[in-house]
């Protein structure tokens, strides 16, 4: 599974974003992380495009790395209070993951954490969403899984949320990231690939062949980007690698083993 519509670009995807904004609902929750979105000017552009289309915009900022369950509930309250009919997530994996669960929680009369971990039931209705990706590596826009930290329970666990109806992946939007964060994202992509690759069955199959190609490309393009941070092609390839690692293509015919991620979740909680 993957977003219904995906737009890949090496330069700013303004036209694609505007086309998608023409299709969305009237009341929009604009979700993002810290101040960098405003500092780069992207926030003002998106606000302007939404207002040009007569949309009512509600801010949902301050989504932290490793988003908390409290932040999810804050977003759900905003959606209910302002009758939000579309969630626009702008950011990296944390923003994108948080909104997946917000989208699901709003449609439920019960606590989504208890629903999934006590009753082992999963949501089936969601508020529509779109994503503008500003950091590659997590591939979060490609699936409906989210990792949320429950501070009260001291747990960091996966939750099932919504799929995005569209995703804008433009490598130009990652140019403002520190190189250290770009490198970390590439290693996250490698970890996704490896944890799929090492999973059963360990027999020859096409998924493994594609996986090997993606891993080779991550290593090659990351080296190129470190040597030349202005290499837009290498930057775009890393974003494409990130998407391929998490859009389920590499998981076909595999019993994935994400124990390295699970160990990190336990430590990170």
Give the label of every model feature segment:
Residues 19, 48, 77, 104, ...:
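Short, well-ordered alpha-helices that flank and scaffold nucleotide-derived cofactor binding pockets
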Residues 145-255:
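Carboxylate- and glycine-rich phosphate/diphosphate-binding segment that chelates Mg2+/Mn2+
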Residues 254-269:
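C-terminal catalytic subdomain
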Residues 75, 98-103, 193-194, 218-221, ...:
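Buried hydrophobic packing segments
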Residues 1-86:
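ATP/NTP phosphate-donor binding region
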Residues 70-172:
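Glycine/threonine-rich beta-strand-loop-alpha-helix active-site module
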Residues 2, 156-160, 266-269:
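Short, intrinsically disordered, charge-balanced linker/junction segments flanking boundaries
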């Amino acid at each position: 599974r993957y977003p219904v519509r995906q737009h890949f670009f090496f330069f700013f995807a303004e036209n694609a974003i505007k086309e998608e904004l023409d299709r969305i609902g009237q009341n929009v929750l604009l979700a993002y992380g810290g101040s960098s979105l405003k500092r780069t000017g992207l926030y003002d552009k998106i606000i302007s495009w939404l207002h040009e289309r007569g949309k009512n915009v509600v801010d949902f900022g301050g989504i932290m790395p490793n988003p908390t369950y409290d932040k999810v509930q804050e977003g759900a309250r905003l959606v209910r209070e302002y009758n939000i009919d579309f969630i626009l997530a702008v950011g990296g994996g944390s923003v994108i993951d948080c909104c997946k669960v917000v989208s699901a929680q709003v449609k439920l009369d019960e606590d989504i954490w208890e629903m999934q971990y006590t009753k082992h039931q999963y949501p089936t209705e969601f508020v529509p969403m779109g994503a503008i990706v500003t950091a590659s590596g997590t591939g979060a826009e490609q699936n409906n899984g989210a990792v949320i930290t429950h501070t009260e329970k001291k747990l960091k666990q996966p939750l099932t949320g919504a799929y995005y109806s569209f995703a804008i992946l433009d490598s130009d939007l990652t140019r403002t990231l520190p190189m250290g964060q770009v490198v970390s994202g590439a290693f996250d992509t490698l970890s996704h690939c490896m944890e799929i690759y090492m999973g059963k069955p360990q027999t020859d199959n096409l998924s493994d062949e594609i996986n090997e190609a993606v891993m080779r490309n991550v290593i090659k393009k990351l080296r190129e980007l470190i040597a030349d941070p202005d290499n837009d092609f290498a930057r775009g390839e890393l974003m494409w690698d990130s998407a391929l690692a998490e859009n389920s293509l590499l998981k076909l015919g595999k019993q994935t083993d994400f124990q390295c991620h699970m160990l990190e979740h336990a430590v990170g909680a």
